[in-house]
Curated annotation (Swiss-Prot):
Chief location: cytoplasm
MF terms (GO), sorted A to Z: ribosomal small subunit binding
Annotated organism of origin: Paramagnetospirillum magneticum (strain ATCC 700264 / AMB-1)
Database matches in Pfam families: RBFA
Encoding gene (name): rbfA
HAMAP family cross-referenced by the UniProt entry: RbfA
Protein name as it appears in the record: Ribosome-binding factor A
Functional summary from the UniProt entry: One of several proteins that assist in the late maturation steps of the functional core of the 30S ribosomal subunit. Associates with free 30S ribosomal subunits (but not with 30S subunits that are part of 70S ribosomes or polysomes). Required for efficient processing of 16S rRNA. May interact with the 5'-terminal helix region of 16S rRNA.
Keyword Zinc-finger: no
Region (Disordered): 120-142
Assembly and interaction partners: Monomer. Binds 30S ribosomal subunits, but not 50S ribosomal subunits or 70S ribosomes.
Keyword Metal-binding among record annotations: no
Length: 142
């Protein structure tokens, strides 16, 4: 979310979650004919819907890792099929246009975790001063 942007409304969150569930169900059934999607385990981690509910960004990650580019291309090619299936599962006036994007939050979390567990950071954490060693407001440090 960019600076100054309004947080999503309850309706956006609810519709996003309904879409995430519906897309995950369609992917789980594996009815795709696209060779890049056949036999691939794909997780839909989040769906962000625009305020007017006309566009939805679908965040996906392949289970077991691997190259996500062919999966994104396959999902883009299967967009019409997905929208048709979603229209049968979710009651909306119009199914949003779907945009697919790799979810990098797991990679970011893993990178942060490895940084926190690095020997240098561990040393700093283990040798951090205790709370009672910090001067308080009434203590001028003398």
């Amino acid at each position: 979310m960019s600076r100054g942007a309004k947080p999503p409304s309850q309706r956006q969150l609810r519709v996003g979650e309904e879409l995430r569930h519906a897309i995950a169900m369609v992917i789980e059934r594996g009815e795709f004919r696209d060779p890049d999607l056949l036999g691939r385990a794909i997780t839909v981690t989040e769906v962000r819907v625009s305020p007017d509910l006309r566009n939805a960004t679908v965040f996906v990650v392949p289970l077991g890792g691997g190259d996500v580019a062919p999966i994104l291309a396959g999902l883009k090619r299967a967009k019409a099929f997905l929208r048709h299936e979603i229209s049968r599962m979710v009651e909306l006036r119009a199914v949003p246009d779907l945009w697919f994007q790799e979810d990098t939050t797991f990679d970011t979390a893993s990178r942060i975790d490895s940084i926190l567990n690095s020997p240098e950071v561990r040393r700093d954490i283990d040798h951090a001063p205790a709370e009672d060693e910090f001067p308080t407001d009434g203590d001028d440090g003398q």
